[in-house]
Amino acid sequence: HLALSSDDTDPAFAPEAFSPFYQRSMYQSMRNLMGQTIRMLRARQADMREEMQRQIGLLVSHQDRLAERFDFFLKRRMSVSRIRCHGDLHLGQVLYTGKDFMIIDFEGEPARPLSDRRRKRAATRDVAGMLRSFHYAAFGTLMEVTRSGALGKRDFAGMEPWARLWQIWSSWAFLKSYLETAGRASFVPSDRSELKILLDAFVLEKAIYELGYELNNRPDWIGIPLHGIEQIIGTAETAGN
């Protein structure tokens, strides 16, 4: 992000302020994505396994409460700049050469139209993509091993807290290093409460996008984003109490 925003003489890469119109369009896009994805889920819900049906019911019952995470974009002017971002940042886009890391595939999320992928965005959206990726790495592996028969349901229940611990620790280490490196940049909120609000919104948006993507391309994988959304609901309820 520091590299992508370093040349303010090139209009294609120069950081830009968020306008009220742009924030409203972000809000509408997020609400539309949630509504479309839930409609697709409900249309196929009857054909899914019992556990997935339960998770979908949980998502539907908390839909309005979850959507409140997007209200920030209507109610408050963002203090950060928007920049040219990766657009689909996750662990699969990061390659280790043996000495350093390389980031690949800057074309953005494949399910989004090109016009949308060309926009400058909040850098925290990429950060949220990485945070979701740590969840995918932990629970995707756990679910695949369970599906193969190497782990039973009891074993899964016993391993789940350890997977969650790894996810939390990895996410914390990544976010801490990111803020230490780029924390003073114009694309990072100086107000940590704003940073949390943005990350909460973008992590939810990413999980909903993943849900729609998996539903259309890899239906057997929808359990991972459903599990992630269930985590979000559980965290919100704990914070509310």
Where are these regions (language model features)?
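ATP-dependent phospho-/nucleotidyl transfer catalytic cores
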Residues: 1-86, 97-103, 109-120, 124-125, ...
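Catalytic-loop signature of eukaryotic-like protein kinases
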Residues: 88-94
